[in-house]
Amino acid sequence: MPEMEKKDDARIVIISSIGAITPMPKSSIYAAAKSAIHSYGESLSRELRKKSITVTVSLPGYVKTKAHERAGLNHLKDKVPWWMWINAKQVVTETEKASIKGKAEIIPGKVYKLVRPFLNFNSAIRVWRKITRRN
């Protein structure tokens, strides 16, 4: 941190997940871990604000990577609608722009920005449960 404190535009980016801010039945450990990362980022952001270090937490939704495959979640490719997937480049681009602007949080992807206010509704949780259910 001492080296970062010497700079005028020091930035830290932390990647969490949209799962940090919504209940995720059957994925409670994942949601809890992402919530902890999100909370850590928010706390760090407030701690370092006085030192002119910007901390941005990114909360992406479903990102097209091989991570789902490696985690044994291949069924998500077929069950999650195409419009809910975003590519990694979009996550990086939107997160970088938010960091440069000094934002503490970014939710990459228009669809996730639109649905965020509804993520804690029971209907949204039921839809998520149906989409992610294994056959």
Residue ranges of predicted features:
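Amphipathic alpha-helical dimer-interface segment in Rossmann-like NAD(P)H-dependent oxidoreductases
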Residues: M1-K6, S45-R46
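Hydrophobic structural elements of the Rossmann-like NAD(P)H-binding subdomain
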Residues: V13, V55-S58, H68
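Residue(s) in the substrate-gating loop at a strand-loop-helix junction
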Residues: S17
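Active-site loop immediately N-terminal to the catalytic Tyr-X3-Lys motif
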Residues: M24-S28
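Active-site helix of classical SDR
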Residues: A33
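Hydrophobic alpha-helix immediately C-terminal to the catalytic Tyr-X-X-X-Lys motif of short-chain
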Residues: A36-L48, S58
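C-terminal helical subdomain
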Residues: V57, D78-L114
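Short, flexible catalytic-loop segment of classical short-chain dehydrogenase/reductase
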Residues: P60-R70, N74
